[in-house]
Amino acid sequence: MNPRVCFVAPFGLGQKTTVWARTLPLARVLATHGWRPTLLIPPWDTPQDDDRRWKDGDVELINIALRGGLLVQLKRLLYEVNSIQPDIIHIVKPRAHAGLVQWWLWRTPRHQRPPILLDADDWEQAWAPINRYPWPLARFLAWQEEWGIRHADGVTVASRWLAETIGRANPTAPLLWLPNGVEPPAPDAPRWRAHAGKDVLFFTRFVEVSPQWLAQFASSLYEKSPGSTLLIAGAPVREGLDRPFRRLLQEAAHPASARIEWLGFVDRTQLAALYNRIGCAIFPAEPTILQQAKCSVRLANTLLAGVPVVASAVGEQAAYGADGAARLVPVQATPEEFAATVAEVLATPAQQRALGETARQRLLKRYDWRMLGAQLHAFYRRILGN
C-alpha cells in the first residue's frame, strides 16, 4: 500500500499564499512518487469551502465544517487525521489550528503515532506588530511557534534564515531547506518582452521598506529616469497600512508624485498588460527578520516570467537572484543608490534581456517544484527510515 501523508493547514486556499502556492504543489509532486497526499484545511478565511471535499488530481483536499467554534473545529481536524491514518503528518506553519493539532498529537508517545513534521515558511512572530494583534493573542501565537519548532520529528523550511534559527532551537531534528518553487509556465503564461517600456513595477504588501525609503527612492528615480512611472501594485496586509506611503508620496512637493500610479491588488489576468509597460520590476527590502525569514512566491514568479528584476540582496532574494538572475543591490544601499541601479538597468536594453533570460533559465533549473518535491520525498523516506 502506498504511504499516506496528511498536511494540516492553518487556513484555506484564499489570498494567503502558503497552502495554494507551496503545500499544494508539493503534494502534487509527492503523488507522482507514490504518496497519497491529503490537505486538511480549516477554511475560516474561505468560508465558501466550508465542509467541502474534492480531488486535485491525486491530492485529496478536505475542508472541515466551521460551525461550533474552535474546540469543535479542532475535534473535527483530529477526527480526520485519525481517519486518514497517515504515515507522516506534516504541520503547515506552527500556528492557529495547525499548531493546536500538533500540540495535541505530540501528547501521544512517539512509538504510538506517525512522525510529526513541521513546515515553516515565515517567522510568524514578526507579523504581530504589523497586524496589531492584541497582546494575549500575540503571546499565544509566539508560544505556539516556539513550542512547535521544538516539538517536531523533522522540519522543512523555506529560507536559510529559518534553517539557522530553527536548527539552533531544535538541533536534533532532521531539517530540509525547501524554498518555494515554480512550475514550467504554460505557453500562454504572461511573459516580459524586450523593449516593453520604461516604467518600474513595485509589488508590495507595504511591509518591505518604510514610507520614507519609498519617497526618497521615487524622488531619486524621477531625477535619474524622468520618463519612468513607478507602478505600485499590491494590497496592504492590514487595512490602512498603505496610508503613510500614500500620504508621504502624494504630499511631497516634487514632480515625482505625478509619476506614481497606485494599482491596488493585481491578479494574474492583469500581468500581461503590466509587463508590456515596464522595463523592470523592483524588490527592495530592509534587512529585518520579516524579510530575512520569508521566501517570496511573487519574486519567484516574476523572475520566471523573464522580467528584469532589481532586488535587495536580503534573505532568499539573494538566492533567487544569484548568478545574474537579478540585479542584486547591497543590503545597506540607500534609496538613491537603489534608484541609480534601476535607472542603469532601464537605460541598458542588453542588460534587461540578459537578466530576463538568465532568470527564467535559473528558476526552471534550480527551483522547479518537481525537483523540490523529489527532495521532500527523499526526506520523508529518511524520516521513516529512522
What are these regions (language model features)?
Residues 243-272:
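Nucleotide-activated donor-binding/catalytic signature segment of Leloir-type glycosyltransferases, i.e.
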Residues 42-46, 229-247:
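Glycosyltransferase donor-sugar binding loop
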Residues 6-8, 191-222, 230-232:
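Conserved donor-binding/catalytic core segment of Leloir-type glycosyltransferases
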